[in-house]
Amino acid sequence: MKTLLLTLVVVTIVCLDLGYSLTCLNCPEQYCKRIHTCRNGENVCFKRFYEGKLLCKQFRRGCAATCPEAKSREIVQCCSTDECNH
């Protein structure tokens, strides 16, 4: 009986994803390769871009607790899986 209980405890611990943290791309460039581990409570990756001067697109990527609101002339895309904000 003790063996069965111990086996169930081990299986439960292995199956639970304890301490999981989302990873998002985090950089201001269009072609981003920098991976960042999000803090506890940041469950969303975002990509924000807008047209700057001379029609140059400016990018920002990172982690957030909720999807940021788009400001004037901005597009914001959000997702919730690892490195999904490419």
UniProtKB/Swiss-Prot annotation:
Expressed by the venom gland. GO terms for molecular function: acetylcholine receptor inhibitor activity; ion channel regulator activity; toxin activity. Its main location: secreted. GO terms for cellular component: extracellular region. Disulfide bonds join 24-45, 27-32, 38-63, 67-78, 79-84. It is found in: Secreted. Coiled coil: none annotated. SUPFAM superfamilies: Snake toxin-like. CDD domains: TFP_snake_toxin (cd00206). Residues 1-21 form the signal peptide. PROSITE patterns: SNAKE_TOXIN. The keyword rRNA-binding does not apply. The keyword Signal applies. Keywords: Acetylcholine receptor inhibiting toxin, Disulfide bond, Ion channel impairing toxin, Neurotoxin, Postsynaptic neurotoxin, Secreted, Signal, Toxin. Binds with low affinity to muscular (alpha-1-beta-1-delta-epsilon/CHRNA1-CHRNB1-CHRND-CHRNE) and very low affinity to neuronal (alpha-7/CHRNA7) nicotinic acetylcholine receptor (nAChR). Belongs to the three-finger toxin family. Ancestral subfamily. Orphan group II sub-subfamily. This is Weak neurotoxin WNTX34. It comes from Ophiophagus hannah (King cobra). The lineage of its organism: Eukaryota, Metazoa, Chordata, Craniata, Vertebrata.
